[in-house]
């Protein structure tokens, strides 16, 4: 005899299934609403204006001569622009026959952007804003009510210089390239790099703080951007057993070497109009003959030396311990930006030279007269000033309700 399910039991089972389905539908609706109106969305970076923090579409070729890996950016790439790319030059050694393959074009980084207006951002936060050309990503530099100014690459707020916290400086590894004639390395705080624009390639300066370049590289080209003022470079102390360093600091220059007793020895000379080297040339050890010396105990074999040109000072650290610190001369006295380019001198072809230098650096933003921001106005800058269209160009004011939070500096979806 077949059993019969009572009607109330059947109804309860149907009710449970119905409630479960309704709950699933509600959860799906809430999930859709969240992802449609509240959850961050993924956006691609389309330009080089935030390099090296965020990269747009680019190639990353390796120079067959010196082995340097570098970036070739494509701003707002089009098939015609990509097809026109054939060869580029290495920014380190100058080798000019490096091919570009359209199939090897890398996509731009992706970021997660909030859908709602950002809470009041802090200085140096990365934010996104919709513009005529699409979504742009920049860095907050000026806050409402402040007076902002750019002097020789440095941001001034209400008349005082402002630098990023060192924890937010970019970090790069730079390859070294030995120059046979003469036997020395000239390390500057800028590097030209190629950007594809219009019909072909144009030269542009990418503000890395130091890199190797021929001693004949001009230091004051008419259209050259401002130099980077804040950077630090770290290398093993034993590096100084075979080489010596020269640092320019505005109207003065320093020679850094290791004594036979393995003490750090600094010699300083003043760069008067008569003694200052011509543009594009470098000082040599003979320029420091008879200069006053300063010495410091230095763990030459096991330690690391850090040279820092930051916060308007030139400083030397040994494993984090400050050895020397010298304030930069006022700009009004020197008539030139204080950039601290680094020159490495050696007479031995077998001298130990690190294959790479670890560099941390801030960014120079050029020059702009003082500007007072409104009560709800923000001042935005790109990390690659030479390729960034930002608040320096004026135009519409940037308001808080236009900004969106970039919740991750780089997020792959």
What is each PLM-predicted segment?
Residues 2-413:
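Extended hydrophobic leader/signal-anchor segments used for secretion and membrane insertion
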